[in-house]
Swiss-Prot record:
GO terms for cellular component: cytosol. It catalyses: N-(5-phospho-beta-D-ribosyl)anthranilate + diphosphate = 5-phospho-alpha-D-ribose 1-diphosphate + anthranilate. Catalyzes the transfer of the phosphoribosyl group of 5-phosphorylribose-1-pyrophosphate (PRPP) to anthranilate to yield N-(5'-phosphoribosyl)-anthranilate (PRA). Belongs to the anthranilate phosphoribosyltransferase family. It comes from Ralstonia pickettii (strain 12J). Keywords: Amino-acid biosynthesis, Aromatic amino acid biosynthesis, Glycosyltransferase, Magnesium, Metal-binding, Transferase, Tryptophan biosynthesis. Its cofactor is Mg(2+). Pathway: Amino-acid biosynthesis; L-tryptophan biosynthesis; L-tryptophan from chorismate: step 2/5. It holds the Pfam family Glycos_transf_3. This is Anthranilate phosphoribosyltransferase.
Amino acid sequence: MSITPQEALTRCIEHREIFHDEMLHLMRLIMRGEMSPVMAAALTMGLRVKKETIGEIAAAATVMREFATKVDVPAEVSDHFVDIVGTGGDGANTFNISTASMFVAAAAGARIAKHGGRGVSSKSGSADVLEALGVNIMLTPEQVAESIETAGIGFMFAPNHHPAMKNVAPIRKELGVRTIFNILGPLTNPAGAPNILMGVFHPDLVGIQVRVMQRLGAKHAVVVYGKDGMDEVSLGAATLVGELKDGVVTEYEIHPEDFGLQMVSNRSLKVADADESKAMLIEALENKPGTPREIVSLNAGAALYAANIAGSIGDGMKLAREAIASGAARAKLDELVRVTNQFKA
């Protein structure tokens, strides 16, 4: 049975859940532009105030995936295939740690399908820093698949893969606050990577997002929240982890000291723009001693664990350090620049 947007809004006001099939229907109305902007804005805020449930988020993500422009990756390259992504919105304004980690993880044997956009809540989104590094981000789905096959990394610029989001973009911009769409981005990888390292902006989302990934059929998901507020594995505090492996969800806490690292503030990782982020990212890839290199090694280690290349985050970190020290991580950046620019007309 379908539900009207007004009925759904009443449910939110009464703090009652919207059921799976109802959420599918409502989300399809939004994606097709068949719900008025006023109603769509009211409903997204109603969900936010009520607090979105695992079922509501999973249903909304299912619809976003339906409407996405997919990237078809050959089965033979789907082993160790992983997405490294953050929800953003952590307000930390650090350099692009997950983007730097992507080069390291790929150099150590992972296949990366990274899905991102321009900075909204941050000074530099993944698209901004990749452009500053010389990567061509305007690829067709076929070119992204080829980039994954040849360079081990494919970057999917979110607006190219979610055309239906044009119906939501003005609402999100005018509201200017976090909505369910901030949570959905990392759940809707157009290449369908079965494994994921996901950073989230709130501790409650660790348990929620990992269970959403479980419902969406992920194989290995590692969801992290640094207790200093970072949507990464942090060096400045303990990190909460929600992990889905072999169909089972576990939640635990990790600390920098577990990996032989000192706890240090993330203050030294802050940047003002994409150019500063680029400089710090290159420092880390070029093995310059310091906090950027350490946090990239740690997060790349977590990505290698999520990709089932390493048996633990600690083992993954050792592989990440080797990839940086050997120059392979820096070479991977140069390779991605070369491969993506070959596609320019």
